Regions:
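Flavin-dependent oxidoreductase catalytic cores
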Residues: 1-376, 380, 384, 388-391, ...
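Conserved acidic residues
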Residues: 49, 155, 242, 304, ...
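A short helix->loop->beta-strand "cap" motif at the edges of active sites that frequently abuts
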Residues: 88-89, 207, 280, 455, ...
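Hydrophobic, well-ordered secondary-structure elements that form the walls
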Residues: 244, 274, 297, 309, ...
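Rossmann-like dinucleotide/flavin-binding elements
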Residues: 367-398, 440-451, 461-478, 483-545, ...
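Rossmann-like dinucleotide-binding cores of NAD(P)H-dependent redox enzymes
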Residues: 398-435, 515-567, 623
């Protein structure tokens, strides 16, 4: 079903894949640039039935780096529509107002406007309660923006009333404390959003209009699914909408929305609940990143279209590759894209560094000759380097010491809910084969090998290794690295879990290793048999919001946490730790190092390359310790700055 056409009003869309709105942060002036055009055109070319671009209705409602309808150069929007239409793809423009959901720092001198002066728990900036004049102007801005979109050749407008942005703030008693006609006590706060939709309809006539809603606020005391249904039904009965896009909750919801902690298509039943009572088409959202999920929710009648933003962010040709049965770069739902946007940074994908750089890629794709490049290392940096090397025209050979490509990503895929990383490795393996890269596994990059081949260019991507903190009295028999634990035979893990375990390091590695072990805890295991010891004030500081669901899961498994704590001494099964000026001990039959590492570089090889004046570069963890995303970016950026004679 996913590749069958469907209609929205009188408008036919070629398939059921809708690329949802994403704030890119690319705007630096009032006119869209080639960077914007290339970003959306690649996804139109990649098989989306429609792509959605964000447009704030006015300057006050714009996020940092967002175009707004009051100041945007009209002809640049028209150019975008033409570029998208050239690929049998429709253009949706989402009409947006941030409301209170922006930081004062990023909003500049513009006041944050909201139904009431209630600060967002994310940004902690108190907005101004909108006056009657501001309400009228904003409503007119929605109408004017819609008229502009129709004029420049867009196909559909989508009115944003979701995720905690302005219009959705009227629905909630937590954010709408007004006492006038637009207050929550009047029609549960639906009056103003319904009037905004009516103004948009009056401005565009029979032009297709979508409304994007959160199925529920998913915050204690907030609005529920039944409230959202009533709103959508009122809008449908008034003739102001032609379809509904249904997402999950708000950004501040304690319930996970789009991370890998959410099951695939997990929020589609909310779309199905609305579809049961509405006659207009419904677009489902959240964690719909593969054909199986899309076919399932369509066949179950939960929706008419499948909306996804990040599947197209990860792979611009996502839909075309699916239809052709080809491998595609899968979204990992790591949420690093969302984290960047919420911090006022530009949109990016940790696993697809070309996202946002499509215009540059078009100019630079074939800069190399048929000279040889050897890439040493089969981890994320090595695979990306080999990919870009081949794309740039090098005859490329990748040397991998292990039996399989992937490096430390193979270990990172072992904790619960991280198996998607194996799909990324499989995609890269297929891509390298398609590009003609020679991959030599179980092959050491010896100095003799490099001397014999004398490649034009060598990329050293040999990764890193753990560097255990020495602890007095702790022997190797009891002291392991997280990497050793993840590779340990199951029977040895089971034996280890009969005792107590202390993990040194409460970052991503430590927390995910704890989850890996907690999943294997035997019945009747000692309470708090796994302890995580972290020197910093918080656990998971390198994970951002992704730490919260993982910490909750670990708490359910009785994993205990010690912060601002340093391990100092081991005596038998007593691990002495220092918390401020206080020293105490915790029980630990096994200690696991989940802290930092050190780069691995063959200095003899690199010195020889230097002495022979042969071109080489060191990338990824071998250059600077980071994570998989930074390693991939490092390798990618090497080739953006590589110029050949």
């Amino acid at each position: 079903m996913v590749f069958t056409p469907f209609r929205l009003r009188e408008l036919e869309l070629k398939n059921r894949w809708i690329m949802l709105a994403m704030h890119t942060g690319f705007a630096t002036g009032n006119a869209l640039t080639e960077r914007d055009y290339a970003f959306y055109e690649e996804r139109a070319k990649g098989g989306a039935a429609a792509v959605t671009v964000l447009l704030a209705v006015n300057e006050a409602g714009a996020l940092k780096g967002m175009y707004d309808a009051e100041t945007v150069e009209k002809e640049s929007l028209r150019t975008l529509a033409e570029r998208v239409h050239a690929h049998d793809c429709r253009l949706i423009v989402q009409l947006f107002h941030c409301g209170r959901n922006e930081s004062a720092k990023n909003h500049g001198e513009k006041p944050l406007l909201a139904p009431s002066a209630v600060a967002s728990p994310i940004f902690r900036t108190e907005p101004q309660e909108m006056t009657a004049e501001e309400l009228a102007k904003t409503k007119a801005a929605f109408a004017n923006a819609a008229a502009l979109c129709k004029e420049i050749g867009a196909d559909i407008v989508e009115v944003s009333a979701s995720a905690g942005y302005l219009l959705s703030e009227f629905f909630s008693p937590l954010t709408n404390q007004r006492t006038d006609v637009y207050g929550y006590q009047t029609e549960n706060g639906m009056t103003y959003p319904l009037e905004a939709l009516a103004a948009v309809r009056a401005a565009v006539g029979d032009f297709p209009i979508l409304v994007k809603v959160s199925a529920a606020q998913m915050v204690e005391g907030g609005y529920e699914l039944t409230d959202t249904l009533r709103f959508c039904k009122k809008a449908e009965d008034a003739g102001t909408i032609d379809g509904v896009t249904v997402t999950g909750g708000w950004h501040e919801s304690p319930v996970e929305q789009i991370s890998y902690h959410v099951s695939k298509g997990g929020y589609a039943p909310f779309a199905g609940a609305l579809k049961k009572y509405l006659s207009v088409p419904v677009i489902a959202c959240n964690r719909i990143h593969d054909a199986e999920t899309a076919e399932r929710i369509l066949s179950q009648g939960l929706c008419d279209f499948c909306g996804t933003a990040r599947a197209f962010l990860a792979d611009a040709a996502f839909a075309n590759r699916l239809q052709a049965g080809k491998p595609y770069l899968p979204c990992q739902s790591c949420n690093k894209c969302i984290a960047a946007v919420l911090k006022g940074k530009e949109l990016f994908c940790a696993f697809n560094p070309e996202a946002g750089n499509e215009a540059f890629e078009h100019q630079r794709r074939k800069i190399a000759t048929r000279k040889e490049c050897i890439v040493i290392g089969g981890g994320p940096a090595g695979m990306e380097a080999a990919k870009k090397s081949a794309e740039r025209g090098f005859v490329t050979t990748l040397l991998c010491r292990e039996k399989e490509l992937g490096g430390q990503l193979r270990l990172a895929a072992l904790p619960p809910k991280k198996e998607g990383l194996l799909d990324y490795i499989a995609y890269m393996k297929a891509t390298l084969a398609e590009l003609g890269v020679t991959v030599l596994t179980e092959t050491e990059a010896t100095l003799d090998f490099i001397k014999e081949r004398k490649p034009y260019f060598t990329v050293v991507a040999t990764g890193s290794q753990p560097e255990k903190q020495p602890i007095e009295g702790l022997s190797d028999e009891k002291y392991f690295t997280a990497q050793e634990i993840l590779q340990m035979p199951e029977e040895k893990i089971a034996e280890m879990l009969q005792g107590t375990v202390a993990i040194l390091g409460g970052g991503a590695v430590g927390l995910e290793t704890a989850a890996f072990l907690a999943q294997r805890l035997p019945e009747g295991a000692a309470e708090f048999g796994i302890k995580i010891i972290e020197q910093k004030e918080k656990m998971g500081m390198d994970m951002g919001a992704m730490a919260r669901p993982l910490l909750n899961e670990l708490k359910k498994k009785n994993v205990s946490f010690l912060t601002t704590t340093t391990a100092t001494l081991m005596d038998g099964s007593k691990l002495y730790v220092k918390i401020g000026e206080m020293t105490l001990f915790v029980s630990a039959d096994t200690v696991i190092w989940a802290g930092g590492g050190e780069p691995v570089v063959d200095t003899e090889l690199t010195m020889w390359l230097m002495d022979e004046r042969m071109s080489y570069a060191v990338v990824g963890d071998a250059n600077e310790i980071g994570d998989g995303g930074t390693a991939i970016k490092d390798a990618y950026e090497l080739y953006t700055h590589l110029y050949l004679a």
